[in-house]
Amino acid sequence: MEFMDAVLTGLAPDGGLLVPESIPDLSNEWPKWATHSFEEICFRVLLHFVTDIPANELKTIIARSYATFRDSKIAPVRTVGPVHILELYHGPTLAFKDVAMQFLANTFEHILNQRKATLNIVGSTSGDTGSAAIHGVRGKKRINIFMMHPKGRTSKVQEMQMTSVLDDNVYNLQVEGTFDDCQRVMKEVFRDTDFKDSHHLGAVNSVNWARVLAQIVYYFTGGIEVMSRTGKKSFRVSVPTGNFGNILAGWYAKQMGLPISKLVLATNENDILARFFSEGDYSRGDVKKTISPSMDIQAASNFERYLYYRLGEKSADVARIMRGFERGEGLDIEFPVSGGSIDAQFAAGTATRAETEATIKEYQEKYNVLLDPHTAVGVFVGEKHLGEDEPMLCLSTAHPAKFPESIQAACGTDATHPVIDKLAGSETRCQPMLADDMTLKRFISDTIYPGENRSVMPLGSEPAAPTATASVDSTESASGAQASGVGSGAKAAGSGSKAVAIGAGAAAVAATVAATANNTATASNTA
């Protein structure tokens, strides 16, 4: 599967993910990039994966994507006390999701204009993905976006950034339930391949390979900057982690030759990923509401990409394990713990609410720097894993003004930003919905095909009887197609390669590519 097909496909037909067929080695290239701009490094990284967009057109997409950022460096590095903070919040919605989402939205537009196709993006968000996606595609003629968020489980600012966008192609859906409920509904909808094809559905979150790819870039820019600044030849990086897409991008950068000696995974009290890497325990618990809501997740969408590589790229094993996890079972495999981790590339830790608030207060009082709650989690855990002779790069994933109540409670300071101030008194629009796939399907159908006179079910209604679905068994395999099986996802183009499916049958992936070529873009999204 080529890059553009992978972007539009998003997921394999069975709901699985895409991974690159091969990972390029840039060990001899990145040391020459010290004087390059963010956009130049972005182009040089992406060129190894984007094989079907001409170089000059790719440069135009990149330039358009980052022209919206408020800092000319896009992702500047600030040295604060014992750590170096990579500021990823200078985009339109003040969150790290803008870095990849602006690129993805402009890539969508490029492909759809070229193919004269339309796309209906369906997504769910735990906070920042929703607003970043909405601001990325608002007003784009060939795209509609349907974005679910869990009621009462995002910050007020995050919700306002979504619901105050009134463009005709934007539909905000407020779901009774948790973010994990939203993800479950997404998987159920996108497993219905008939519905996907007939409604031209597409993905914008980190299940879409292009999102992860774009995030790889700032590990190179940030790492090169911090090594240049300190004179060191390697560095560590601490990443606030919920859905595993951000730190997975760091893992890819490491495989590509960037000298990251340790990937530090930081979670809040929703610690499923920290438990996995520390103890090998990937058992799901109840979602806990915290002051870092974008990490309030108990089922990380990108985890199966890591699992695919960890299991030796064995699709059937990944498919079997992830199916068991969806049924409420633990992982049907044991990973030995050595040196406090099941993988020497990773270290992991958790920050409680008290520890998060204490970190916010400490950095405000000691360094006059405000950290948003997610960044504070990363800094707290990162400080626990400082190397003796290596700099620690901590990813700052959101501007503190997105979480004013938490900042005020932690240190008594008002966190403000002009972008946030403009939200006050804004008109909003939002549709309440059940956490049910049939309700979501009906709303999408009524919106796209209004002449059929079907209405969305109100909250409290009984879900409609399920319709027949056409999904592909993750454990199936096939030969003779352009894609081959990977577990519960698929392989996307990289270094001139075609795409491969993690858990979807190869023939099914090939069929999806064919459908895409006929103006039917299929995929899925979670945040």
Segments from the language model and where they lie:
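Membrane-penetrating hydrophobic segments
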Residues: 487-504
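Membrane-proximal, acidic/low-complexity disordered segments on the non-cytosolic side
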Residues: 515-517, 521-527
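C-terminal low-complexity, Ser/Thr- and acidic/Pro-rich disordered "stalk" regions positioned immediately N-terminal
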Residues: 470-491
